[in-house]
């Protein structure tokens, strides 16, 4: 028994004194001293601490933090010897859940209690459960960017911070619904207001504020965001996060599974907000026509949100049935993520045959587009000088598996081009296909996109892909093509009220156009979406965002093995992209479906990947930790294993196995 003394007061056993500080990491925190032995287990030490404090309260959330080892002592049956704790250990007895401020995708601030002792992935599951967001595996936390020091001390405007620190959910029990919202949000007017903030789109930002916010001016600037992601396999405490710190909550993985407006109002709204701010802050590029469509959708969504039309459709349109089918398949999956239809192998593979204009940019050439007879079968594109020569040898045959497919469209100018970057021994071979009209473009574009993923036009998703492309093009078409609704007047005079175009477009368009030039263009585009309900408009916005060429690419500065210069590595949901840093051109693409294995040498901070056909790629990370690249690859592979039949069941162990590293902390 610890603490046996002789008559003179000397200890005669193997006990020793252990000092424990009470509270969070604070040099001035009060402390108490316990008499323990190496055989004392953590549970017994916790009991002694509570007895010494002599204060009645709920201590169930408290645990011991070992400062030197950056470790929580959560195994209460382990002894001090097993942990390796000696008398010089700095131990803190404090709560495992502590308040943090989250900056949400809609840019609003929310204070809640997060776990500082569990791996971040598990903490995210709890946070998303509190916020009523399904599929927490798609989200993560970033460190807030450091604030620039200003020469003049400007008084920061006061910001409303919503508070959920007093809301506690019972573990293992699905939150009940009450009055159309999760029951824990209906406890008070404050929590109810918080739910409305989460589930309803925010009004357009102040144009002056929008111009002052930092925006990336180059591809290099876009890499800075991705250096701030927290490690999913370590807890907040291990990563230096303190109580009261501000963190950003964002969708990290651009693979959105089973997006349902009925069950996902918060997830849908926050995803829309992240897409909206990506466009407004120029994190992703779009054309002038596309920006007008995005502005019109924002204007329409804001009108419905302000009028209180949250769930009821603003009109009906039989033509939306096919679009709804396309939207239901918006999840982006890796190849092989689900078994292919058995009937696919029994049917004949559809072909595309048509006249297209083709252009192959080469150095020192002035030749433009030339018309050819083009045949597209399975994943192979062949083109001939004329239709009569088709049975013979083609001018060129291209296998599109693993290629980059980039749209180059101007609807008002009747320009429907497809840019293909096809892998070749010399790098990426560039070729342009010019289509005659929207229908031809949609068929060929859908075929190219599927072929790039190794799938053919016999795939069940081909028709929905064609419809989704046509739907996006129809939004860019000028004139009232959407069919009106009596509840939403179509005329510019009736719709212009409250429209400030500068809050709906990126700053580069603010500089290019005056407000009186933007307003009629936005209202004209609005006629194509005026019949949509709020959730339909948000889904259409997300779909249009997903159609952009640069959608879903996270950028990191790396240096490839054997190279003397830095380059950009783009990480998408199904591929890695090598990009020239100086000009932004794609140099090479590697598909995850062709990847055999990857590993990280934590000592030299190098990622090595092996692909089929004995292709080996190795690089060191410059702008971010190689852990971030490792986690992206493992995370996307994990997301590809999700199946609709399993519902919301989440294999946390598999995620941590695929994304967790062995980095020496």
Swiss-Prot record:
Family recorded in the similarity comment: Belongs to the kindlin family.
Domain FERM: 229-556
Gene from which the chain derives: FERMT3
Chain positions found as Phosphotyrosine: 11, 502
An annotated GO cellular component: cell projection
This protein's UniProt keywords: Cell adhesion, Cell junction, Cell projection, Phosphoprotein
Subunit and partners: Interacts with ITGB1, ITGB2 and ITGB3 (via cytoplasmic tails).
GO BP annotations, alphabetical order: cell-matrix adhesion; integrin activation; integrin-mediated signaling pathway; leukocyte cell-cell adhesion; platelet aggregation; positive regulation of cell migration; regulation of cell-cell adhesion mediated by integrin; substrate adhesion-dependent cell spreading
InterPro entries: Band_41_domain, FERM_2, FERM_central, Kindlin/fermitin, Kindlin_2_N, PH-like_dom_sf, PH_domain, PH_Kindlin/fermitin
Phosphothreonine modifications at: 589
Intracellular or extracellular location(s): Cell projection, Podosome
Record-annotated membrane-spanning stretches: none
Record Pfam families: FERM_M, Kindlin_2_N, PH
UniProt comment concerning the protein's domains: The FERM domain is not correctly detected by PROSITE or Pfam techniques because it contains the insertion of a PH domain.
Function: Plays a central role in cell adhesion in hematopoietic cells. Acts by activating the integrin beta-1-3 (ITGB1, ITGB2 and ITGB3). Required for integrin-mediated platelet adhesion and leukocyte adhesion to endothelial cells. Required for activation of integrin beta-2 (ITGB2) in polymorphonuclear granulocytes (PMNs).
Protein name: Fermitin family homolog 3
Entry GO MF terms: integrin binding
Annotated PH domain residues: 354-453
